[in-house]
Structures are given as C-alpha cells and as structure tokens.
Amino acid sequence: MTVSTVPFLALSAVGAFATAPAWAADEPRAAPPMSGADGSDVDDAQRSDILVNGVRDKRADVAKAVAPLVNTPRSVVVLPKEVIDQTGSTTLEDALRTVPGITFGAAEGGNPIGDRPFIRGFDSQGSIYVDGVRDLASQTREVFATDSIQIVRGSDSTLGGRGSAGGSLNIVTKKPELDNFGSVQASFGNADYKRVVADVNLQLSDMAAFRVEGLWHDQDIAGRDALYSRRWGVAPSVTIGLGTPTRLTASYYYLESHALPDSGIPYLYTLGNAPGTGEVHTGPAIGTVTTAGGQTGFVDRSNFYGLASRDFRDATTNQAQLRVEHDFGGLTLRNTARYTHNDQSYIFTLPDDSQGNVYGTTATNSGGALTSGGYVWRRANTRYGYSESLIDQTDLFGTFSTGSIDHSIAVGTEFAWEKSRRGTLNVSSGFGNSPRCTTATLARDNCTSLFTPNPADPWVNYASDTSSVVAPIVRNPGFAEIQNDARTQSVYGFDSITLTPRLILNLGLRFDRFTSIAQAGVATADTPRTRIERTDNLVNWQAGLVFKPTPETSVYASYATAATPPNALLGEGREDNNTIIGGRDPATLTVDSLKVQKTRSYEVGAKASLFGERLSLGLAGFQTDIRNARVIDANQNVSFIGENRIRGVEFSVNGQ
C-alpha cells in the first residue's frame, strides 16, 4: 500500500508545518491557565500534569483520570494518533489489534454488525466512550477524527457506570489548537484500495480556533470476491476562549457507510448434522473437501456465498457536542452535553452450516431435498434500527492540598436518556424448507454450490417461500419492532491522594440509578404490547495503592467493581441478561430473576515510563470474580451458572 502525506500551511502563515504532538491538548486543566498548547512556558507547579516535552497530559480530556498513567493503579494503555497512523489503522478494530488482551467478535449469536471488543475475555461492546461520554450504538467506528484511544482493563463501572467486567475504551477526538496547520494523506493499495484523510486547523484569533477533519474511503476486500466498503465523513469543531479561564467548544461528527458485508466461509459439519462422523465440530470448509455423498472439490478462501444484488449494509452516525469549561483557583468546572443519532440497516448472508447441506445429511429425501452435501444455504440475516441518546455530564476537577497531603480530585454528575428501536426486513430466503437446500431453493438462488458460488446470481425476492409473486424488500410492520428506553442519573467522585512522594492512594465511588423499559414486538397492530420496566440502583467503587521506587516506576495493587443490569445494552447487542431475548414476548421471562450481574476485579502490577516517557512498560496479574453469571442456552433461555472466575497475566509495551 502506498501512503502519501501532503502538509501545508493554513492562512498563508509563515513557518514550518506543524503537527499536534502526542498527548497534546488545547485547553488547560486548571487555573492559572496553562499555555503549553501554544508554545509558551509552563511553570514548575504545573509540571506534574505534563507527559512529553512540555505538552499537556491527555488525561485532561477525561476528568475522572486524576493521575498520570504511571501513577494509576490499573492496567491502562493509550494509543496516540502517531501509532494509529503508523499502523495504517482505519477503524477502531484495526487500531486495537496492536493491544494485548483485546479480541473482536463479529455479528454471531444474534449480535448486530458493529464493534464488539472483548477485553480480558468479556464482551465490552457497551463500554465504549467518546471523550468520556458513553457511545452505545452498534456501529463500525472510524479513526479519521481520533487523537488517541484509551483502554482501561478490569471492572470499570466506577468510571462509566453500568459496564462489563473486562474494561472500557475511550476515544479522544481531535480538537482545535492555537496554530495554523493542515495535512492531506492519500493511501492506495491492492484490491482497489483508496483513502483520503484531511486535517486542517485554523487560528481565528488569539483565543479562537477552528478545526475540521474529512474522510473519503473506497475499497474492495483483498482476497474476497465481490465485497466492498465505502464511507465518507466530516468532523468540524470550533473553540472560543483558548488560553483563557473560560472555554467553549462546539463539535459535530458525521459518518456515512455503505458496504457489502461478509460473514465468511461455512463450517463443514457439526455433531447435530453429520451423524456417524463422531465429530462434535470441524474447521471451516476450505481447501479440498469431500462430502458425505462422495463429491470432492476445492473451496477457495475467496469464495463469497452472499448475493451482490440483495446484501447490503448502510449506516450513518450524527453526533453533536457542546462543552463549556471554566477555571477558578486550582479547579476546573466542565459541562459536556451530547446528542447522538445512529441508523443502521443491513442484509447479510450467513453461509449456513447448521442444516447438513454442506457436508450432507441422512434426512429423508422429501420435497426434492439435496442430502448428499456440497451446498450452502444463503441464510439472510436482516436488521434495521436506530438509537438515540442525550447525555449531560458535569465535572469538577483539579488539585489542592490538605497540610502535607496532595489531592487530585474529580467529582461529577451524569444524566442520560437513551433509546433504541430495531426490526427486520421482509426477505424470502427458503427458511420454511428443512433441510434448507432443496431443488426449489436452489432454483431461487437461496442455496448455492459449496465449490463454485456465484455472487451475481439473479436472486429475486418473493412474497413467501411458496409464492411466485415478486415482492419488494421492505421493513416489517412497526408493531413488530423491539423498543428499548433507558434513563440514568449518576453521581461520582475520585481522589488520587499523594500521602508521600513514594506512596499514592487512589479512591473512587459511583452511584447510578438505571431505569430501563423494554417492549417486545407484537403480531398485529391491535395486539397490546407487554411493557417491562425496572430500576436498578448500582453502587460501585475502586481502591488502589501505588508505591513508587523511582519517579518513573510504580508498583500497585487495586480492587474495582462492575455491575451489568438487565437490558444494559438496550438491544444494541446480544446480552446473556437481556430483558428481551430475540423478539419473543418478555412476559415469558421472570423479571425478578434477572439479577444484576456483579463483578470484582483484583489486580497487582508494575509500570515503568522510560526514555523521556516515550516508552511505557506494564506487567499485571489479575483475577475477576463474577456473581449472578448467566448464559443463553440452546433453547434461547437464560441459564444461571452462579459464579465464575477468570485469572490472567498481561505484559504490554507502548511507545512512540
């Protein structure tokens, strides 16, 4: 892949091309205002807030981060934009592939397409934040407007409220600076890869600046037939009051995506559909394959089993944010208000291996069933929906001393309103046939060859599997939608207490009142909906002790909790304690039995910051205990398994 970067100077400013250094921030953390962002001197009393070459610590963008990373008794990794750029990352998933302890799931198990990170083995899709504010919707997040990504491992409900036991992700966006600079980066590669990213910052006055990032991205998928991904986005922002005690930042983010989604290669068989093999499961059907009927052929890794004329994924994100800050004394008061609206709809083909069509089945050959194997059912997974949120956070943070003891504190409140709506599209895909692949479904292109699938098959949607009437692909009726709403009121506080230069105590406490309302879809417009409303009061806390052998090293021990109430994801993910499983009537669930899933994390570790804080080393051992653990069984019922425990060790190297 070829990458070209063209720098330029905005407004005919004279001087060298400027880029924002790692950890740079444009606003001060506390009065008197710091001016490191615009190049002036910083006094000695403020140097504890500085990481690199007199530049402000990026923790200023997350008020709850009351200590530098080396003094934080948690396993925390920060990816600056330099690392994101140098690794060629274009999405959140790309960027996090470089971080140990994080894997990504796909749209399996009923999850919608979108980012699904697993941190320390726990699904953390509901614990993603942008500038410290929850970003719940299922989506594939871009990085063109990202300045850094912060990963906190371990139980984290003290930081963000309801959340997973594994940890959380916080995306820090680019913001205006008192400077003139800009760049255009163009990338080209195989599979018709084309990407252009622009970043322009204009200093409007000695206290105001405007910044805008833009994206255009178009590519096929290397090594896969027919697939493509296209998207564009823009992210303008303006700040007034830079370098003064009072600052206002208004920002907007828009991303539009269009893609032909891919769900991969089918498995050959499972125990349920391959009797006599003695195998519980097998690997993907790739390479030379022999079916139960004796047919031998070659399955190429590039095979795409979907339909180019049917499958699609369209998504848009609109996000508007207003942030106001004021410094007084050694404290900063900040209010952040954000409105977010996300839309997503898709049809993607799951190359289904559950019906015995791939390997073959002993099912009775009735109705023209193809039982000898060598076929793939093009199961259509469909979804449309949107999510909205309006969240307001108020934070007071800063430093002060009580005698010989120094405090770095953050206290705040959060009020959130969230809702999601989701339904399905009316698509005929042969679901009524068993086994799925028959002469009829093959003739209608709802099944295809395992060895030679054709994405350009002339598939047509019919009113039903038995109808010959052509029908448009439309949304199913609104009364069939699943509806979720939530309200949250929170209060929290953090204190990093420097007892001595070598000993630091870190404390945090949070209370959340989380009310959720869930309503399943119904069969007719006249059928009344069943409404489930519940309120959970969640108390979470954390405590840690840090010992510093040297200023650049630390050894720590910590304890933290997390709480995941039912319906925590509002249907934007597949939950083992979701109030509504799939689309069935929630009245079939005993609401009182859905207890809050609670976790406790114990962690010990050591950190070192080397070479002028350009290289960070971390080693941590952890144990996570889960109470009220549960899973979804094969019959789509919630099964309680009591307690669960996970232990692990992590080693990380992070630098620039």
Residue map of PLM features:
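Periplasmic plug
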Residues: 76-81, 86, 98, 108-155
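Outer-membrane beta-barrel translocator/receptor signature
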Residues: 144-147, 158-236, 242-247, 318, ...
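Membrane-embedded beta-barrel scaffold of Gram-negative outer-membrane proteins
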Residues: 325-327, 331-338, 342-348, 556, ...
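Acidic/polar loop-and-plug regions of large Gram-negative outer-membrane beta-barrel proteins
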Residues: 217-222, 234-241, 245-325, 343-387, ...
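Structural signature of Gram-negative outer-membrane beta-barrels, strongest in the C-terminal barrel
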Residues: 241, 387, 406-418, 425, ...
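Transmembrane beta-strands of outer-membrane beta-barrel pores
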Residues: 186-192, 216-220, 254-258, 328-330, ...
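Face-selective signature of the C-terminal outer-membrane beta-barrel domain
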Residues: 322-340, 379-519
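N-terminal Sec signal peptide and the immediately downstream disordered periplasmic leader
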Residues: 1-89, 93-99, 655
